[in-house]
């Protein structure tokens, strides 16, 4: 009798994706982040669903409904903090996943890579709209400042901003539509993730050496299911340590003050995972220029496959490129720090230098270094 998991139409898809999937035998822990992102997404959808049962998207009651969740709903506080800190874990995994792709040359799978960039944009949009929902000071002013950036678009900018707001300022209409989009987008992310996986399984996984691994494959289950479970346990442990011991570590104290359109906070800043892009935005004195730089800071990932000049796929055997990669990581950490600082000397200059360095590494130094390394190897 043929095994049902190999014949049943639905079970067959799951079997070919998670059980009998031929996987390179040498993929490291850096390949765990895909499954961790899946776990984060499921966790966010579930906690978000329970929060949505008690949340009201009205300017007069939004803040108090979040307070009500934390004070009166059974285990509401843990659901709320798991959702808030789950977003942080989501972005940590996302950035590590993208970093892995850059380091090991996974961007040569262009379809998978491009769907991944769309996923990144969608998750960022979801997180931004979610941050507006508690209707605290930083929610309100963050929404005002970021949506206002669209007014830099020539000719249609002002109309576009008012269309998004549903009025002449961030108000009830804005909050209601942000809640609607914040609810629906995670399901769009789920669908895109399935497409991401579909394209990945067309080519098979990359591996640390960058060499085709068709001659050395092992089944996904049990080897990588066990490995992924270990990763998941470490993820949940980290998340719960954050939630139970310092749930507000990554948040902003200003968001515990109800939104007040008449009082601007001294330092308006987004959540920590957007600070690097915010620093790039602020480092350009011109509004339109800043908005373009902000968009390009992520869109630049789309042209990385075109800038691949090395004869090797990954950076495993390319020490000079490795140095540049870690310089890029340090630069992004610097930008993240600068994004959270006030706009004054010396932070402005540091931010501008770090922004220039970010684009220079990706657009100029990495392709040139790859050519130099090719010549060193005399290939």
Curated annotation (Swiss-Prot):
Can you name the source organism? Leptonychotes weddellii
Q: Where in the cell is it found?
A: Mitochondrion inner membrane
Cellular component, GO annotation: mitochondrial inner membrane; respiratory chain complex III
Report the Gene3D superfamilies cross-referenced here: Cytochrome Bc1 Complex, Chain C
Q: What cofactors does this protein use?
A: heme b
- The organism's superkingdom is given as Eukaryota
* Cofactor binding: number and manner: Binds 2 heme b groups non-covalently.
Q: Which InterPro entries does UniProt cross-reference here?
A: Cyt_b/b6_C (IPR005798), Cyt_b/b6_C_sf (IPR036150), Cyt_b/b6_N (IPR005797), Cytb/b6-like_sf (IPR027387), Cytochrome_b (IPR030689), Cytochrome_b_C_euk/bac (IPR048260), Cytochrome_b_N_euk/bac (IPR048259), Di-haem_cyt_TM (IPR016174)
Binding of heme b b562: at which residues? Answer: 83, 182
What this chain does, per the entry, is described as:
Component of the ubiquinol-cytochrome c reductase complex (complex III or cytochrome b-c1 complex) that is part of the mitochondrial respiratory chain. The b-c1 complex mediates electron transfer from ubiquinol to cytochrome c. Contributes to the generation of a proton gradient across the mitochondrial membrane that is then used for ATP synthesis.
- Gene behind this chain? MT-CYB
- So what family is this one in? Belongs to the cytochrome b family.
In terms of CDD domains, this protein maps to: cytochrome_b_C, Cytochrome_b_N
- Kindly provide the name given to this protein in its UniProt entry: Cytochrome b
Which of this chain's residues are annotated to bind heme b b566? Answer: 97, 196
Q: What else is known?
A: Heme 1 (or BL or b562) is low-potential and absorbs at about 562 nm, and heme 2 (or BH or b566) is high-potential and absorbs at about 566 nm.
């Amino acid at each position: 009798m043929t095994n049902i998991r190999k014949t049943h139409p639905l079970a067959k898809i799951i079997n070919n994706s998670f059980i009998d999937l031929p996987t390179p035998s040498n993929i490291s822990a850096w390949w765990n982040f895909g499954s961790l992102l899946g776990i984060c997404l499921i966790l966010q959808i579930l906690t978000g669903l329970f929060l949505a049962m008690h949340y009201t998207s009205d300017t007069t009651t939004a803040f108090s409904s979040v307070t009500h969740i934390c004070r009166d709903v059974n285990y509401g506080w843990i659901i709320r903090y798991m959702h808030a800190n789950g977003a942080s874990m989501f972005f940590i995994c996302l950035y590590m996943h993208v970093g892995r792709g850059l380091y090991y040359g996974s961007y040569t799978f262009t379809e998978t890579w491009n769907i991944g960039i769309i996923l990144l944009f969608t998750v960022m949009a979801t997180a931004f709209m979610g941050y507006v929902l508690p209707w605290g000071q930083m929610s309100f002013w963050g929404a005002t400042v970021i949506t206002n950036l669209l007014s830099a678009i020539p000719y249609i900018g002002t109309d576009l901003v008012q269309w998004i707001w549903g009025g002449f300022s961030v108000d009830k209409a804005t909050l209601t539509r942000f809640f609607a989009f914040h609810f629906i987008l995670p399901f769009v992310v789920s669908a895109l993730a399935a497409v991401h996986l579909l394209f990945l399984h067309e080519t098979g996984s990359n591996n640390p050496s960058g060499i085709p691994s068709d001659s050395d494959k092992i089944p996904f289950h049990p080897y990588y299911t066990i490995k992924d479970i270990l990763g998941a346990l470490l993820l949940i442990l980290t998340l719960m340590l954050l939630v139970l011991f310092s749930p507000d570590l990554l948040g902003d104290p200003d968001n515990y003050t109800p939104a007040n359109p008449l009082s601007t906070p001294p330092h308006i800043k987004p959540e920590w995972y957007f600070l690097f892009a915010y620093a790039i935005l602020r480092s350009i004195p011109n509004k339109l220029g800043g908005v373009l730089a902000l968009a390009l800071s992520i869109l630049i990932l789309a042209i990385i496959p075109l800038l691949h000049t090395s004869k090797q796929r990954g950076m495993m055997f390319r020490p000079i490129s490795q140095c540049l990669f870690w310089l890029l990581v340090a630069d992004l950490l610097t930008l993240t720090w600068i994004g959270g600082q006030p706009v004054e000397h010396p932070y402005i200059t540091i931010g501008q230098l770090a922004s220039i360095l970010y684009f220079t590494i990706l657009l100029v130094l990495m392709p040139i270094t790859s050519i130099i390394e090719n010549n060193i190897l005399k290939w």
